[in-house]
């Protein structure tokens, strides 16, 4: 099944009225950091009578129970594995809408993390074997075998995968660790990105190179992932002096073990194509790789 999809089990009338509207507003809202609007989750409604047998095998399920006292609960691997099942109960439209609201934050978190885990699982099924460039860089990166080394020097590696009408990319460079990663705000991170773009990411035309798109301010947040401190930035890139652009997902990562900061970025070029699932794969690659720097780092703390 497609990444970031949810099966919603509810009767057709409810789906086409306020209950369906509420679920769509909360779960099919805009996925942050993409150049075109794409929904956060792809929703597929299924009436109760169709919810049996193989149709219960979706990884993510929201089941609306209209005949019980108001509450919500989660079950893991209820009908299949892996699976996150959310049951929302109520005995009136109002009480069901309230429970949808109450469960939203936890549910989005669980579904999002579950899909990153699923993406990691897919990566590990067929990982890239040639990792010499990463070994030289002291980084244990896991990525699908469809990626190949595109460019490398002593401070920079660039992997690329061809996709329909474009390519998906991961770059890694090292920064000295004098500066705390959380001292970077959006403006100083953009400045850093643009200088790295000028040094390492040329466009197709002479004197052209990748920069952050000026029209849209990126989203930024602090992340603690398995004990690793990271600054996450999502936004869109363009090429100065050329007509190219797309989404990026950037992490500044504290690598205490090697006394450095890693600048790791995934970016996608695929004009007029949907890019949400490509960005989710890049996030999974980066997070899967970072778990491997966390183990020795944690031991040292």
Segments predicted by a language model, with ranges:
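Signature of long, low-cysteine stretches enriched in small and polar/charged residues
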Residues: 39-42, 46-90, 198-259, 273
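Solvent-exposed alpha-helical segments and adjacent loops
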Residues: 1-10, 16, 65-127
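Short, well-ordered beta-strand elements
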Residues: 83-92, 169-174, 260-271
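Single conserved hydrophobic/aromatic residue that forms the stacking wall/gate
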Residues: 291-301
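A short acidic/glycine-rich loop-to-helix N-cap element
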Residues: 92-98, 262-285
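Secretory pathway targeting signatures of secreted, lumenal, and periplasmic proteins
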Residues: 5, 9-13, 18, 144-204, ...
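N-terminal "mature-domain start" segment
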Residues: 1-2, 16, 25, 123-151, ...
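N-terminal mature-domain "stem" immediately C-terminal to a signal peptide or N-terminal signal-anchor/transmembrane
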Residues: 1-37
């Amino acid at each position: 099944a497609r990444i970031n999809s949810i099966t919603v089990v509810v009767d057709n009338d409810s789906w086409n009225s306020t209950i369906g509207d509420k679920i769509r507003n909360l779960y099919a809202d805009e996925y942050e950091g993409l150049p075109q609007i794409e929904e956060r989750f792809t929703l597929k409604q299924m009436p109760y009578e169709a919810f049996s047998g193989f149709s219960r095998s979706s990884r993510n399920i929201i089941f609306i129970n209209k005949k019980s006292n108001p509450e919500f609960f989660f079950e893991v691997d209820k009908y299949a594995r892996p699976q996150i099942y959310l049951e929302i109960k109520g005995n009136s439209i109002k009480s069901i809408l309230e429970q949808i609201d109450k469960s939203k934050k936890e549910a989005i978190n669980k579904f999002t993390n579950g899909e990153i885990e699923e993406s990691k699982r897919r990566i590990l099924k067929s990982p890239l074997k040639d990792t010499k460039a990463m070994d030289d860089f002291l980084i244990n990166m896991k990525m699908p075998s469809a990626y190949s080394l595109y460019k490398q020097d002593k401070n920079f590696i660039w992997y690329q995968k061809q996709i329909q009408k474009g390519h998906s990319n991961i770059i890694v460079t090292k920064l000295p660790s004098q500066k705390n990663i959380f001292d970077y705000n959006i403006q100083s991170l953009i400045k850093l990105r643009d200088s790295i773009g000028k040094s390492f990411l040329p466009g197709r035309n002479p004197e052209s190179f990748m920069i952050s798109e000026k029209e849209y301010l990126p989203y930024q947040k602090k992340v603690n992932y398995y004990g690793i401190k990271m600054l996450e930035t999502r936004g869109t890139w363009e090429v100065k002096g050329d007509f190219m652009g797309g989404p990026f997902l950037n992490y500044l990562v504290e690598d205490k073990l090697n006394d450095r900061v890693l600048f790791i970025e995934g970016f996608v070029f695929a004009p007029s194509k949907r890019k949400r699932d490509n960005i989710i794969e890049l996030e999974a690659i980066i997070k899967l790789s970072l778990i491997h720097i966390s183990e020795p780092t944690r031991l040292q703390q």
